[in-house]
Amino acid sequence: MPSMEVALLNGERAAAAPGLKGECQLCGKPAQAKCGPILRWHWAHAGQRHCDPWMENEGPWHRAWKALFPFEWQEVAAHDAKGEKHIADVKRPDGMVIELQNSPMSIEEMESREAFYGERMVWIVNAEKFRSQITIQEALPNPQADFVADLIFVQPVPDPRTNNVVILGDGQSLMFFRRSDVWPDGKPTYQLHSGRSLGDLVVQNYVGHHLCVWLKPREVWKRANRLVVFDFGGEAMWEACHYGADRLFCVRRVSKSKLIQSLLDGKEPAL
């Protein structure tokens, strides 16, 4: 049964401490502080129940991320106009919600949570479990660069023999078609071009985007409509995104420290 970091004690949010008895901030039912010598201190519903189906069992990854934010932002009860209630992992005073996802999730639940929390929401996903299935490949230019509108980049083919992280970075191994390559009758020629023909344009217009191959992808993160950031465990994190007019699935390098600082400063997520 999922545990809680926060319960209400005499109507005020409180962390667990020995001997305390409080109330669940979502449903108002009794909550008991669990403060043993082995597990971290936490709150639990009295009896075998939990009132929020979106909460998951938490491990070290989940707790470490929560601890980066002020206690007042952690496990905040949220309500919508219809009376539906859920507990956001992290919610800033300005309404920005940060959901920390460790376990697999259905597309239906993802869509429900995005609809509930609205557009000001960030998914931070523990991607260490499927890190070996993602190959980060060649760099892409800024999708907003003028010359990119003419290009149709070719997505690499998944190969289980090369499912490790390979970051090249200069664009030379890219392959693409040009929309402007047409026959006199207007039909596309489908002439394939090499990234070498772009010279230094990729390096000069690089803002973190990379092609990637994802073996056995978790489709839920390809279909999410809010910001999704994969945590592989290091300083570099990766935004899961769609590139250009063709919406080619790719990843974008994100600085973990800059992302966290922007969220703490009350700003939009720094990417």
PLM features per residue range, with description:
Residues 1-19, 129-271:
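Non-catalytic C-terminal interaction segments of nucleic acid-processing enzymes
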Residues 120-125:
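Short hydrophobic alpha-helical runs that function as membrane-insertion/retention elements
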Residues 1-74, 80, 255-271:
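Nuclease-adjacent, charged terminal/linker segments that flank catalytic cores
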Residues 15-18, 28-34, 61-112, 129-141:
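Active-site metal-binding core of divalent-cation-utilizing nuclease and nuclease-like domains
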